[in-house]
């Protein structure tokens, strides 16, 4: 598990190396209502055409997971007591085993 804050270049490089990984898009300050799960290759969170800081700057962080096994711990760390994301991306439709 790796977290990116104010490092879009590092984050985008991680998504290229781990296209089958998972990304939790979260607010800068933990908010259990905003823990969005994406696949690492989701174009809504890995398009290099966005302005610098669009992904890991401003109000957001990215928590990157190379395997599904890490997901529950990461979600709990963000305040999700059941260890699940608050939402799954409607574009990449990440599937996880229950």
PLM features: residue spans?
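Mature, structured domains enriched in cysteine- and short glycine motifs
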Residues: 1-98
């Amino acid at each position: 598990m790796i977290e990116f804050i104010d490092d879009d270049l590092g984050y985008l490089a991680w998504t290229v190396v781990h296209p089958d990984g998972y990304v939790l898009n979260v607010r800068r300050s933990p908010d259990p209502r905003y823990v969005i799960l994406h696949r690492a290759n989701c174009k809504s969170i890995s398009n290099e055409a966005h302005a610098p800081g669009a992904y890991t700057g401003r109000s957001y962080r990215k928590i990157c997971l190379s395997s599904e096994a890490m997901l529950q711990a990461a979600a709990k760390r963000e305040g999700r007591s059941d260890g699940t994301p608050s939402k799954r991306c409607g574009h990449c439709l990440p599937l996880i085993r229950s």
